[in-house]
């Protein structure tokens, strides 16, 4: 059985992944299949699925995505990439906090993997995108 803090951590993680997926999906709707969004939106879907598996393991109800129709729109791909940088930095900070909320190996494994994806892959991709001006 999860503690209240662990449940809150899972909900916070899922909410953040929903927000990222919905934001990056909106960028693709607005600008077409632009890199790095076309790759990262797929990664965000995998992150959501990883969290859904944890929810199922503990018998928790998976909430609906609250971000549909509520994410920002950007004037350019560069602006979207700059926002992606900020979002991924915030995501790393979120997972730093969530990693302190549990000692459960399965939660730590998922939180570390999702943090690593933001820090080592998504953040780098958005920085490259912003530096290209697209």
Segments predicted by a language model, with ranges:
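All-alpha RGS (Regulator of G-protein Signaling) helical domain and cognate RGS-like helical scaffolds
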Residues: 1-134
């Amino acid at each position: 059985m999860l503690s209240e803090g662990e449940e809150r951590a899972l909900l916070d993680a899922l909410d953040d992944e929903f927000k990222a997926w919905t934001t990056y999906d909106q960028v693709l709707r607005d600008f077409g299949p632009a890199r790095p969004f076309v790759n990262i939106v797929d990664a965000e879907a995998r992150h959501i699925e990883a969290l859904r598996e944890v929810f199922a393991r503990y018998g928790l109800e998976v909430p609906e995505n609250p971000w549909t129709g509520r994410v920002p729109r950007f004037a350019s791909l560069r602006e979207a990439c700059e926002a992606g940088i900020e979002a991924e930095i915030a995501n790393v900070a979120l997972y730093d906090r969530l990693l302190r909320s549990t000692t459960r190996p399965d939660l730590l494994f998922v939180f570390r993997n999702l943090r690593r994806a933001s820090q080592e892959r998504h953040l780098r991709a958005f920085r490259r995108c912003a530096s290209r001006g697209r």
